[in-house]
Amino acid sequence: MKRTYQPSVTRRKRTHGFRVRMKTAGGRKVINARRAKGRKRLAI
């Protein structure tokens, strides 16, 4: 059986990247929440 996680850098960046997060209000909320929490990595 094939596993569900088949890593791809392109897909990873396109769906969870910083620029994608900044496009929507919800995404910006995520970034701000991670900033407030003090996360080292805000987005992938």
Curated annotation (Swiss-Prot):
One Gene Ontology term, aspect cellular component:
ribosome
Keywords for the protein's UniProt record, in alphabetical order:
Ribonucleoprotein, Ribosomal protein
Q: Does the keyword Transcription apply?
A: no
| BP term (GO), one | translation
Query: Matching InterPro entries, A to Z?
Result: Ribosomal_bL34, Ribosomal_bL34_CS
Q: Which family does it belong to?
A: Belongs to the bacterial ribosomal protein bL34 family.
Write down the HAMAP family for this protein, in alphabetical order: Ribosomal_bL34
The protein's name: Large ribosomal subunit protein bL34
- Gene that encodes it: rpmH
